[in-house]
Each structure stands twice: as structure tokens, then as C-alpha cells.
């Protein structure tokens, strides 16, 4: 019988073009009970705001779905999702 592979959680960074959007997303993450860290936006990421949210998910699809379900309005409009390793842009 084959072994079942369990995906390990990956880290993602949600960067913003405005401080207002970052604060709104932070409130949305808190309301959803999500585990996250407010971090300085990495230099490798070009964003108008110096704050980003770092969180873990089982993969890019899960991270994108979580952000789409949790972050709304202007916060979603001015947010960009990246993988934390290599800062590959996802949305």
C-alpha cells in the first residue's frame, strides 16, 4: 500500500498598497480567528504600505481562498498575495 503524503503548511505574505487596507485586513484576520503576524513588508515586495500580514496555509489555493473569503472591500482591492519563500506573486 502507498503512503499518504500530507502537505506541510506554507507561509504566505499579504502586502498592501495602503495602511488603511492593511489595518482592515488585520481586523478581518482577527475576526476570523486566524493565526498571523503583522510584519514589515519585505524589501523584495513592491508595495505602497510598509506593513504586511504573514500567515500559513496548506498551499496556494487554500491561501487564496482564505484571503478571498476573509478580506473584503478596499482591503481586498489593495492587497497582493505572495508566497513567503521567494516572494512569488499569487494574486
Where are each of the predicted segments found?
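Short aromatic-glycine-(Arg/Gly/Cys) micro-motifs in beta-strand/loop hairpins
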Residues: 4-12
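Amphipathic, hydrophobic secondary-structure cores in small proteins
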Residues: 13, 17-65
